[in-house]
Amino acid sequence: MSKQWASGTNGAFKRQVSSFRETISKQHPIYKPAKGRYWLYVSLACPWAHRTLITRALKGLTSVIGCSVVHWHLDEKGWRFLDMEKQLEDSEDFLEHWHDVAGGIRTAKEDSSKSFAEIKNDSQRFMVDATNEPHYGYKRISDLYYKSDPQYSARFTVPVLWDLETQTIVNNESSEIIRILNSSAFDEFVDDDHKKTDLVPAQLKTQIDDFNSWVYDSINNGVYKTGFAEKAEVYESEVNNVFEHLDKVEKILSDKYSKLKAKYGEEDRQKILGEFFTVGDQLTEADIRLYTTVIRFDPVYVQHFKCNFTSIRAGYPFIHLWVRNLYWNYDAFRYTTDFDHIKLHYTRSHTRINPLGITPLGPKPDIRPL
């Protein structure tokens, strides 16, 4: 996309506020919990949508809430699905992929990206570039927005949590969608282990909310404010802020590792990694929200968004250990991370930043072994 991202004349990027902010609960007058009623529309490239896929998997909701994946290439009309008119829709793959952790996209199962030279922006590889939209045959995410609200006039973003019964958008704010998925709303449809999974435990909620607040502004959104800056002074301010807060995360994780090493001994790495998280000694929403930025940092943000003081692997040993622990030891993280979609989306969609559309092959590997 070649249009400007800055708001006004100061050259600073401003993120759009989400428009659909409902929830799902037994008490809600419209949106009641039900198996098969709700659907997620996501991009595997998008860090905000990635949050929802990880949460959906960790909570055991893949069989409860289906998922469709848009094409990695974002053009002037927005996110799009594959045209499936010529596909065999009764194939076994077609029937099963909706409830896969990554919507059936095959490259999400791979831990290393490949050559991109022969891949065109209009590539139509089923369950590689995208899936179709199975309910209405829509070609664009925008079609869902207009179906929900014919007067909608803002940008067409993902993720979208959709209600098939009322044919409306429940919510398009990722931070709220993951809270909906983590709530007890769908407990009757999952097993006991997943019922016990709580990504925002009451005793840690205040700490999680505080951590999320500064991570969002300075890291999650900070890389975008850096990469989309249209004045040098804005860029320099934002990139310094990103790395100041990565330093803060590194200190938190360094201190955490030291305490765990003292508790378990340096040799018991399995026990150390079992409690090596950002807030508390268990996996929480704070880890999910930070992960989706950190996993994209070396492959994309270092070069594409000019966040190039250092890389995670070279400059932040404890963040590097933390992100590899999540990727290699938790399927919900690993199998929703698609390095092909991530690299192709940013380098092919942001023509103002990368006008030739050449996708860098490095770093190699996309993620190092644990």
Swiss-Prot record:
Annotated effect of mutating residue 46 to S/Y: Completely inactive as thiol transferase. No activity recovered against 1-chloro-2,4-dinitrobenzene (CDNB)
Binding site for glutathione: 15, 79, 155, 158, 173-174
One GO cellular component term noted in the UniProt record for this chain: cytoplasm
One GO biological process term: cell wall organization
Classification via Pfam families: GST_C_2, GST_N_2
Keywords of the record: Cell wall biogenesis/degradation, Cytoplasm, Oxidoreductase, Transferase
EC number: 2.5.1.18, 1.8.5.1
Note: Present with 1670 molecules/cell in log phase SD medium. A version of this protein truncated after amino acid 200 is not active in the beta-hydroxyethyl disulfide (HED) assay.
Subunit-structure text: Homodimer.
Protein name as annotated: Glutathione S-transferase omega-like 2
UniProt lineage: Eukaryota, Fungi, Dikarya, Ascomycota, Saccharomycotina
Gene from which the chain derives: ECM4
